[in-house]
Amino acid sequence: MATAPSPREENVYLAKLAEQAERYEEMVEFMEKVCAAADSEELTVEERNLLSVAYKNVIGARRASWRIISSIEQKEESRGNDDHVSTIRDYRSKIETELSNICGGILKLLDSRLIPSAASGDSKVFYLKMKGDYHRYLAEFKTGAERKEAAESTLSAYKAAQDIANAELAPTHPIRLGLALNFSVFYYEILNSPDRACNLANEAFDEAIAELDTLEEESYKDSTLIMQLLRDNLTLWTSDMQDDGGDEIKEAAPKPDEQY
């Protein structure tokens, strides 16, 4: 007779079901229960990827909504439709509250449990990168002192991740490449530093190319995909530094079978 699954295993399975059903809010809840069950123990690679996918989808939907509403707001403003602008701003504020709450939830989990329990180099980089990502998402819509604080927290997390990645992970490692991708996007979009963005992306790409023959088979697909995204962004950024941002900038979006 098969032994009954532990609550942790059960919640991992439920998270996978929720993912298949595209019920990402519930997927987050199940993975938060997994984190609670793990206590001070490190999550498995599968568990951390499921957690990342859950939050990425929950935040991704709101980030997309915010961009659409902000675009409509700009159009209505240019037309002088003040009544509409006021309504849109209230609605945008509602989305921003949701974004703040989601980011706050994962950042608290990262600081209280995930980063302290990370033992291996790749898990430390994974979680510090994740911390940088969610501070960056806050910086996308915050203004004034709050934006400055979010940007500084992003930079601090990405730099800490970069130090460990450079010391412990190969240039072709998908987590190191994913960090370089998102860090360069931060320089370009949040700090308005296209030169630094291009330098970082270019260096990561060149270092990976130089060691491509050492790439392990299981991570070949993941690594080459991120390298292509780095190349896409470099092409976009260098083609016209004055571009209005109409083209979509690529960032690392993990799937369950991808290690970044």
UniProtKB/Swiss-Prot annotation:
The source's superkingdom equals Eukaryota
Q: Where is the composition biased (Basic and acidic residues)?
A: 247-260
Q: Which Pfam families match?
A: 14-3-3 (PF00244)
Residues of the region (Disordered) are: 240-260
Q: Name the protein family.
A: Belongs to the 14-3-3 family.
Query: What is the name of the protein in this document?
Result: 14-3-3-like protein
Organism of origin is Oenothera elata subsp. hookeri
